[in-house]
Every structure is written in structure tokens, then in C-alpha cells.
């Protein structure tokens, strides 16, 4: 068995085997030059999930990421019948790989390409001497958050404690940002990003 899969849950390993058997392949691109396909997939995922406008990073954001951090970026693609059906955008530095953004085309969700993205990422990380992969959390603070639970399947033996500071340093500016976003009382912090 693949040694990196020791971290993966049993159901995760099964999904990876099934996806590979169905014909999904993958490609890891170091220092990517063109991320247009990734952007199409990412934005379609945000549409499907009815994401907040906050998550619709504009093209200039990605252009700046590539301009300043290209040598520390990998783009991971899941490929099925010569089509890119899912992709992940990652940063790495000092032996830590950080998941940033990812997406899957709706019509291929049944093939579970997101599992292949994580599998390919873990293989690349191991081959390149990474000590940790940080996938981030979910879309809420709940321990039952579906995205968080999905990511947890890939880290059976490793879990990081994670804290977010919730201090408001400038109440006036904070309140103005909340007002601009028409935000009411919420448990989400910072409220203007909800």
C-alpha cells in the first residue's frame, strides 16, 4: 500500500482507488503560468455552493499571486478523458504546503475528483520533502462542517490546533465595513466577511 495513504481514512482510500480505476489521472504543475482553466472550475464551484462574494477573488488577485509567489505555487489538476475536471491551488514554503483554493466541475462530482486532487497533492508533497500539508478548515466554525469533515479524511493521524484572534483594533473602521456589507449581528468573525 502507498505509504502516504496511512494518513487517509478507509473511506478516503476507497474513493481514491475507485476514482483512479474510473480513469481519472492527475497532473501537478509547479510554477504555473496559466491558471485560466482553474479559474473557470473555481468560479463554477463558488456558483454551485452559492458562495459569498468575498470568495470570488478577481483575476488581478491571481495575477499578483503568480507575479510574486509563482515559485512557491503548485496547481494540481484532475483529468478525465483529456478534460480538466477539478483543480487545486496551493502555496508552499519551508516544507509546509498550504491548500488555498480548489474546485470541481458539477458534472464530474460523481467521479470524486477532489479525492484525486488531495492524493496527488500528498504524493507531490512527500516527493518534495514537505513535512506538513495544511488543508484549512470548513466554511463555518462547526466541527460537523461538511468541508471540514471532508478535509479530515486526509489527516487521520495529524490534526492541528487552530486559533483565530477576534480582537477589533479599530471599532470605527470595523463598524463601517459591517455597515457597507449590511451585516447584522452574527457569530461569524469578522462579520463583514460573511
Which residues fall in each region the model found?
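Alpha-helix boundary/capping detector
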Residues: 64-68, 125, 151, 176-178
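Secondary-structure boundary/capping signal
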Residues: 50, 73, 129, 158-159
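Repeat-unit-sized solenoid/scaffold elements
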Residues: 67, 111, 120, 158-167
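Active-site/acyl-donor-binding loops of N-acyltransferases
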Residues: 1-3, 131-194
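A conserved beta-strand-loop-helix scaffold within acyl/acetyltransferase catalytic domains
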Residues: 1-110, 123
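A broadly tuned preference for mixed-charge, low-complexity surface segments
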Residues: 16-22, 76, 83-89, 127-149, ...
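Acyl-donor binding region in acyl/amide transferases
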Residues: 94-156
